[in-house]
């Protein structure tokens, strides 16, 4: 397996069966994975903040830092590799309250709400999520099978089982 690390404020696309996309230490950030099971193409975004209007220059410099600029770029890149927008299935993890126990800023919740709004407007189904709470999470997406793994509190679980192989209905 070829592991491709998705860093903070980063986005990667996988198109080969042996590739695994992984992002680590999702606290208040959100890790969004999207996958087309028929084309066996997927992508992952690790964004930090909900809205680029707080710093438009930084949003232009690195659109993956923000939900409103990063999510459309992720969809564009995955579809550019051959995925069909109508078949995209999305999963999200993160959005925790890590350093803000009184939820004064509640960046995690704001990140999650931005995600829901953007995906709804784009017509993309959010099929699953592991958001909120106070735990850091790690996510891995196996491109060949579509399996999605979540690690939280030292325990790993499969969020999405294997999809039928490429070329099916």
From Swiss-Prot:
Coiled coil: none annotated. It catalyses: L-glutaminyl-[protein] + H2O = L-glutamyl-[protein] + NH4(+). One of its GO terms (molecular function) is protein-glutamine glutaminase activity. Its EC number is 3.5.1.44. It holds the Pfam family CheD. It comes from the Bacteria. Keywords: Chemotaxis, Hydrolase. It is an enzyme of class 3 (hydrolase). GO terms for biological process: chemotaxis. InterPro entries: CheD-like_sf (IPR038592), Chemorcpt_Glu_NH3ase_CheD (IPR005659), Cytotoxic_necrot_fac-like_cat (IPR011324). Belongs to the CheD family. HAMAP family: CheD (MF_01440). Probably deamidates glutamine residues to glutamate on methyl-accepting chemotaxis receptors (MCPs), playing an important role in chemotaxis. This is Probable chemoreceptor glutamine deamidase CheD. It comes from Solibacter usitatus (strain Ellin6076). The gene is cheD.
